[in-house]
Amino acid sequence: MRIVVLAGGIGGARFLRGLKQAAPDADITVIGNTGDDIHLFGLKVCPDLDTVMYTLGGGINEEQGWGRTDETFQVKEELAAYGVGPGWFGLGDRDFATHIVRTQMLGAGYPLSAVTEALCARWQPGVRLLPMSDDRVETHVAVETDGESKAIHFQEYWVKLRASVEAQAIVPVGAEQAKPAPGVLEAIGSADVIVFPPSNPVVSIGTILAVPGIREAIAEAGVPVVGLSPIVGDAPVRGMADKVLAAVGVESTAAAVARHYGSGLLDGWLVDTVDAGAVEEVEAAGIRCRAVPLMMTDVDATAAMARQALELAEEVRA
């Protein structure tokens, strides 16, 4: 079975670990969000791609869900001693090596997709990890601070400000001009199932869908497209998805997120058992819906979620 998964960072990576357990023989292609990418200290940092790579390769800091295990921060401390920032983004010493290799390869003319493949050769994530595009796309957030309207990088909004100010708009800068990375449209076209994990629907999956050709390819793939709600009990399971949903005029409910994706894209939707009351509303929107436990408390629980998603896909197919 060929499965394509659109993934952001922590939520997508943890779901993928469960999916690999649920479908050990499946051929899994991950289309990773690169809208979170940021240039720091002259280096190209790809937080979502790295989180997937480290998580599936066994190198992730399990407690925080991002960054490397057994990490140290001596380079960061030395930079701070020179008065060089930003200090709010936690790049560890081991992590720096990844970004140095990536930046060197990009500078030598390799596209991001080839660089990602080379990095994965070390980590052996057990999936084919593709960036959504080789072109530069950056998600920016329009905010008002100190009476001044300005656009800031998504990482500054999310990590530095902790989404503490209202997001007035979310803009994937460069997405309109970007092309899907090599292999992305081919993977979608040959998939048996396409899955939207419980990643952020606006700044993770939404950014991937903003690259021209990807949304259309999924809608026309002719195979079941199933998603899992990142909203449980009217609140995000983790992160601050409610803040960015509000910016695009979507309520923080499991049903509202399903409608946001729409029946033209989504065939099936899983909501948590606490949101069982939303099933009827989602089905009224033309999307098959089931209520199942959706808390990724451990790999077994996550694998059970993945199995439910694949079962729902088979129901849709039938």
Swiss-Prot record:
GO-annotated biological processes: F420-0 metabolic process
Query: Which purpose does this protein serve, as stated in its record?
Result: Catalyzes the transfer of the phosphoenolpyruvate moiety from enoylpyruvoyl-2-diphospho-5'-guanosine (EPPG) to 7,8-didemethyl-8-hydroxy-5-deazariboflavin (FO) with the formation of dehydro coenzyme F420-0 and GMP.
- Pathway it belongs to? Cofactor biosynthesis; coenzyme F420 biosynthesis
Question: Per UniProt, which keywords does this protein have?
Answer: Magnesium, Transferase
Self-association state and partner proteins as the record states: Homodimer.
Which EC number(s) are documented for this chain? 2.7.8.28
Catalysed reactions, semicolon-separated = enolpyruvoyl-2-diphospho-5'-guanosine + 7,8-didemethyl-8-hydroxy-5-deazariboflavin = dehydro coenzyme F420-0 + GMP + H(+)
Coiled coil, from the record = none
* Keyword Ligase (UniProt): no
Q: Please give the cofactor(s) recorded in the UniProt entry for this protein.
A: Mg(2+)
| Record-listed 7,8-didemethyl-8-hydroxy-5-deazariboflavin binding positions | D50
Task: Say which species the protein is native to.
Answer: Streptomyces griseus subsp. griseus (strain JCM 4626 / CBS 651.72 / NBRC 13350 / KCC S-0626 / ISP 5235)
- Which family does the record assign? Belongs to the CofD family.
Protein name, entry field: Phosphoenolpyruvate transferase
Against InterPro entries, the record matches this protein to: CofD, CofD-like_dom_sf, FbiA/CofD
Matching entries from Pfam families are given as: CofD
The terms under GO molecular function for this entry are: LPPG:FO 2-phospho-L-lactate transferase activity; magnesium ion binding
Q: Which domain of life is it from?
A: Bacteria
